[in-house]
A protein has these predicted regions:
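Short functional hotspots at interaction and active-site rims
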Residues: 1-188
Length: 188
């Protein structure tokens, strides 16, 4: 694993950040609440947090150096069939010839149809080294996204969709470039 990470780091300066497209998924639910709060001195910070039933969904997106692209929200978990449909219907129409699509090592990312769909658009596929979220700038984007969603405290899937749309609209090109720089894709 360490050798793969070293090889990845050595190759990073050679890649054009404008051509990199990082894809990942993250879980969202209707019980998301802020993890920290503030209150006046000597007063307890109190907030309500839902317990019991909640609804879960999965958000898939691509991160480019200038924006979050191809957002997709699905109720429940992602499997190979869902991921393949996402690629065919949402991501591939946005890919440009010469793009480099970077995926983590999730088993649903490694099926033959994934590579076939991406290469058919003139793009190439690269897989991150195992256990390397620090090399994936979309992880930083998801952290910012989830902070917004916790603050919004959406308690229904419809409210969650609205909060997600608001959060995605708040991402500026400078934010995306910062995520790339933090992960050392610095030709921006």
């Amino acid at each position: 694993v360490q050798a793969a990470r070293v090889l990845w780091r050595q190759a990073q300066p050679q890649w054009d950040s404008q051509r990199l497209v990082f894809i990942d998924e993250t879980g969202l639910n209707t019980k998301m609440a802020r993890l920290y709060g503030r209150s006046p001195t000597h007063q307890r910070c109190v907030a309500s947090v839902p317990h019991g039933h909640w609804q879960s969904s999965t958000f898939i997106a691509a991160l480019r150096a200038e924006s979050i692209a191809a957002p997709f929200l699905i109720k429940g978990a992602v499997n190979a069939e869902v991921f393949t449909a996402y690629l065919a219907q949402v991501l591939c129409p946005e890919l440009r010839r010469g793009d480099v699509v970077v995926l983590d090592n999730l088993s649903t990312h490694k099926i033959a149809s994934v590579t076939a769909l991406i290469t058919a658009r003139g793009a190439t596929v690269r897989y991150l080294p195992p256990y390397s979220p620090d090399l994936n700038p979309i992880e930083l984007a998801f952290a910012k996204l989830k902070a917004h969603l916790r603050q919004a405290a959406a308690r229904t899937l419809l409210d969650l969709q609205g909060a997600l749309a608001d959060s995605l609209a708040s991402f500026q090109p400078a934010h995306c470039q910062g995520f790339f720089r933090h992960a050392r894709y610095a030709s921006i």
